[in-house]
From Swiss-Prot:
Gene3D superfamilies: Porin, LamB type (2.40.170.10). GO terms for biological process: monoatomic ion transport. It is a multi-pass membrane protein. This is Maltoporin. It comes from the Bacteria. Pfam families: LamB (PF02264). Homotrimer formed of three 18-stranded antiparallel beta-barrels, containing three independent channels. Its main location: membrane. The gene is lamB.
Amino acid sequence: MMITLRKLPLAVAVAAGVMSAQAMAVDFHGYARSGIGWTGSGGEQQCFQTTGAQSKYRLGNECETYAELKLGQEVWKEGDKSFYFDTNVAYSVAQQNDWEATDPAFREANVQGKNLIEWLPGSTIWAGKRFYQRHDVHMIDFYYWDISGPGAGLENIDVGFGKLSLAATRSSEAGGSSSFASNNIYDYTNETANDVFDVRLAQMEINPGGTLELGVDYGRANLRDNYRLVDGASKDGWLFTAEHTQSVLKGFNKFVVQYATDSMTSQGKGLSQGSGVAFDNEKFAYNINNNGHMLRILDHGAISMGDNWDMMYVGMYQDINWDNDNGTKWWTVGIRPMYKWTPIMSTVMEIGYDNVESQRTGDKNNQYKITLAQQWQAGDSIWSRPAIRVFATYAKWDEKWGYDYNGDSKVNPNYGKAVPADFNGGSFGRGDSDEWTFGAQMEIWW
């Protein structure tokens, strides 16, 4: 008994050391932004986004606290074979109080197995919820190729002239299909699962410093037995993507062309939508009808222009043409130059313009937005974070159309459709006005 008791402190110390080593091996990554702002005409900070545009210029124009907290660990390794477990919990609140409760979103929980297939060295097998090979424009927070969700796949297969990746993911729509509930009345409360099958060929070196990535995504509604799609629903669709990435001026330029059909046009990023119905006030259902096509031409990048200047930029044209004439044409162009006073202090300006034309009315909405920010950041790159900035933003807009959400779909045939700003004596869109805001914000990724 004496020997056992003497060994106990040593056993505890060894166990603590092992647990400490394991704890230190956990990878902690994430993203967060938060701050405080005011509006020139009074009240809390307002943010500005053009009606019909799918994003906004974000510098000095974010009104929420948002965070993603990622924990992951390599849980097994033998030679070059390994298993990695990855998780991500995200949340967003209105940024108006000390205590703001919200339900977190469990966005990632997956396992990735590397080099598990002997005849496919360098490849990765994965399954679970995952941010899957996302492509975005940072300065407008716009994801143009993103099939994230629960799924499985095999990626980075070396085919000699590039890397091949195969994946299947899922998203769902509330009320997407129906069955008879009682008295021959359709019940729209069931969710419809939308599956996406993704094939990508990346890292093809086609010119000095330049690579090409090609992708095809097919999305379709996957109905339960004895269910039917609502009338006019879009059952499936395709998205084709070509992206050229060029190393230039210590940075990069990406040129992207995308074409989508039917259910892949609404979000335009690779997730299928359109098989479902939406609910206004949780009472009346209206169809999401997006049969048609989408064309997107996009150029964006980040470059260094000497020791003291960096710049982000974006230019995009997007045409969503729907059979029901409720599509849009969206042009956007913007720049974010940065002047570095010291390795940790800079002045940043962002200038952005959006123009959105309604297919149904032919009218246009436009907005100019400019932000000037003084910033302190952890490094001398435009990508350096964390950053603390104080900013002032001015926006001016003129909107000639908006979406009609008055009443409900049972009595309003225009519900959810684009209408002129003064339709039927009403007021749709944001009109013709301007505003300025100011505040402070932190942003970090790690």
